[in-house]
């Protein structure tokens, strides 16, 4: 043994050939701070080892190295710039040391080889993979960019254009593509991977492969003419500006880094990369996006714990109520391996549900995600039925009938008689209290809410609503089932609107009040989309949700929270509803809609809206962007905080993920609680108090006032690592 540490070991595997084996005690290998330090010492040991002819990098896991340890990022990023710069210099000195070994090096690449893992293998001379290999640099998705030499080495290995595509998109390449672009030198069968890599290294040792020339290319300036460079970088900047936009600076910074470093050799180019990385790491966007990644891991951990705690795994499911929503739920269940009965009282609805499932499967087929055989198998695992036959075998029932409490209660009561005492019943409702529906059941402990978002196949969030009598076993089984479906389940306690709709309607309330006071809804949409970063402004979102749906839900919320959400007379939603302007579904709402060539609705402003809104809106007046943002966001933020204060939602992490996954809250802001930490709770309280005359929606919750006085934050040190 040449060197041994907790996460890696170095030994001589044949005459003069040493193997660096990454072998962390965890389920995956990561380039955390400890592993980097061990790799540094391992390379020193190799340098001092006599008779060294070549070095192999291998992993004892299915994935080579999944990347750096993201749980350490926020702690590192919180350090002063000088310390962060020193850490990066240290990390880069390690990869330079690997690249500068006086012998050829080969990486044995399998499974996920991402981020720091990819940057590690880029420092080797040769890279051999198998068909499981997925290699890439996803850092821009976290608001940063490669900082271990990825912006320097990748363009020199595969060319600037391909490198910029991979880095700016945060893309991982499958083995075949990686081979085609030169990121891998060979792809072989898994059982031959080690032997092939060893043979490749032997060929390099025997000078059958010119590894020195390959290394020279990586450590020199990029070979681009002035014209080639101008065309390449100008085009890349244009594409990135169009796709990433102004709220996500990392992709553009990566392009600038590659451009600035192109004319320099490795060490100077690394200095440029380091300078830009530090700037990104200190940004609020990086803090928010890394925070979201950690929050996502947090809710996945909760789901895994629930699955382990559940006494029974869901093997079969049933959906009551077909149509688009029922078909979408059935499709998602079947796609993830849980056969499902889809029951309805109308054949036309069953046909619609099966058509929806077939349509979604055809899209998967067209994209090459599944083959015809698998498609047929998935479709066969959805059983449409007009009767309850076989439903007694279902472990979980998802009721997805019309949003009417009497109809839902009747259907749930009826199906309870058809199933065993262990069967879990759930209701896919967006507004009806779970405690109300539970009154119709003999076994309310086996019942909870399971709120899917539309379209089911795209929206990651599922709200799991705990009723007064819901048992822990029921929650555990439903959370586990939602996770099995590929969803992100978040448990909330019962209240009108649950969590997502409860916090959405004060936002719509702020919108209605702005219109009442003379604001232009098209300006509000532009500000909330372009400045704040929502995917849709409130008027457009209401049209997509459906004015009729929003009108109904608004009444439910007003009844549940009369002080904050009770209406003072008619508003814009009422006016449109009464004029039968329901939004996209009937072609006219705040905007008018026509279908484009692809069959997608395209919105346009029409003067016909003006007389409809006139009775409920003051004469138009100008509002500055900040006033619009404040008046829109304060009610939502206050309601989110109240939900945490009242225990409707358990944690800031779950709330922020629910907002991003369920409502499209701008990811670069990280969710409401991350946003509050970013702007400063005391600053938010002072800002909100300037608008308090607008009504109870603008009244700051006591929790925020107390936290502002104490100088507290929501995330504090709980997501901080240590350097």
Swiss-Prot record:
InterPro entries: 3-OHacyl-CoA_DH_CS, 3-OHacyl-CoA_DH_NAD-bd, 3HC_DH_C, 6-PGluconate_DH-like_C_sf, ClpP/crotonase-like_dom_sf, Enoyl-CoA_hydra/iso, FA_oxidation_alpha_subunit, FadB. PROSITE patterns: 3HCDH. The keyword Iron-sulfur does not apply. Keywords: Fatty acid metabolism, Isomerase, Lipid degradation, Lipid metabolism, Lyase, Multifunctional enzyme, NAD, Oxidoreductase. The record marks 119, 139 as: Important for catalytic activity. Residues 1-189 are annotated as: Enoyl-CoA hydratase/isomerase. The keyword tRNA processing does not apply. GO terms for biological process: fatty acid beta-oxidation. GO terms for cellular component: fatty acid beta-oxidation multienzyme complex. It catalyses: a (3S)-3-hydroxyacyl-CoA + NAD(+) = a 3-oxoacyl-CoA + NADH + H(+); a (3S)-3-hydroxyacyl-CoA = a (2E)-enoyl-CoA + H2O; a 4-saturated-(3S)-3-hydroxyacyl-CoA = a (3E)-enoyl-CoA + H2O; (3S)-3-hydroxybutanoyl-CoA = (3R)-3-hydroxybutanoyl-CoA. SUPFAM superfamilies: 6-phosphogluconate dehydrogenase C-terminal domain-like (SSF48179), ClpP/crotonase (SSF52096), NAD(P)-binding Rossmann-fold domains (SSF51735). NAD(+) binds at residues 325, 344, 401-403, 408, 430, 454. Residues 311-723 are annotated as: 3-hydroxyacyl-CoA dehydrogenase. Its EC number is 4.2.1.17, 5.1.2.3, 5.3.3.8, 1.1.1.35. Pathway: Lipid metabolism; fatty acid beta-oxidation. Substrate binds at residues 296, 501, 661. The active site is at 451 (for 3-hydroxyacyl-coa dehydrogenase activity). In the N-terminal section; belongs to the enoyl-CoA hydratase/isomerase family. In the C-terminal section; belongs to the 3-hydroxyacyl-CoA dehydrogenase family. PANTHER family: TRIFUNCTIONAL ENZYME SUBUNIT ALPHA (PTHR43612), TRIFUNCTIONAL ENZYME SUBUNIT ALPHA, MITOCHONDRIAL (PTHR43612:SF3). HAMAP family: FadB (MF_01621). Heterotetramer of two alpha chains (FadB) and two beta chains (FadA). Involved in the aerobic and anaerobic degradation of long-chain fatty acids via beta-oxidation cycle. Catalyzes the formation of 3-oxoacyl-CoA from enoyl-CoA via L-3-hydroxyacyl-CoA. It can also use D-3-hydroxyacyl-CoA and cis-3-enoyl-CoA as substrate. This is Fatty acid oxidation complex subunit alpha. It comes from Vibrio vulnificus (strain YJ016).
